[in-house]
């Protein structure tokens, strides 16, 4: 009888440990996620944003389209051209600089292609399109405030 009680005690402790371990893994994964909120609405990208050299990297087409910026991809030269009424942004993959209205701007994180998807630095793109950007490190959320003057 004592052996059976010991067995159930160990089984209970084991189940509790497994439960806490799984909860910690799920919690850690959720903390690792980066959220992007534009004018109070959470943006959903088809691939997840990530951090590179302290900069949040996002899929270029998703962020430009969310900001209402026209975008084109040049596959031969591996470059992105984005334009709105006042700004033209030219970015080349792998380069640590970009051009905004013809002026060279150094980047903290170079745009890159991962699994066939092009990622660009969110703050650089958003601010140069005319948005205000802030980061909440506690919730791992980027807040973008943007007024598209065309609408």
Enumerate the language-model features and the residues they cover.
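Primary recognition of N-terminal secretory signal peptides and signal-anchoring hydrophobic helices
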Residues: 4-10, 16-151
């Amino acid at each position: 009888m004592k052996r059976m009680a010991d067995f159930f005690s160990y089984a209970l402790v084991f189940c509790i440990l497994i439960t806490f371990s799984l909860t910690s893994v799920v919690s850690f994964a959720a903390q690792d996620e980066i959220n992007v909120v534009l004018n109070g609405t959470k943006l959903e990208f088809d691939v997840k944003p990530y951090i590179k050299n302290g900069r949040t990297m996002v899929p270029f087409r998703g962020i430009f389209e969310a900001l209402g910026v026209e975008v084109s991809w040049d596959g031969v030269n591996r470059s992105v051209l984005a334009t709105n009424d006042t700004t033209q942004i030219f970015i080349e993959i792998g380069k640590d600089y970009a051009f905004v209205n013809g002026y060279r701007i150094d980047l903290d994180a170079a745009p890159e292609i991962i699994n066939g998807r092009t990622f660009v630095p969110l703050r650089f793109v958003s601010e140069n399109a005319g948005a205000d950007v802030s980061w909440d490190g506690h919730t791992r959320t980027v807040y973008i405030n943007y007024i598209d003057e065309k609408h």
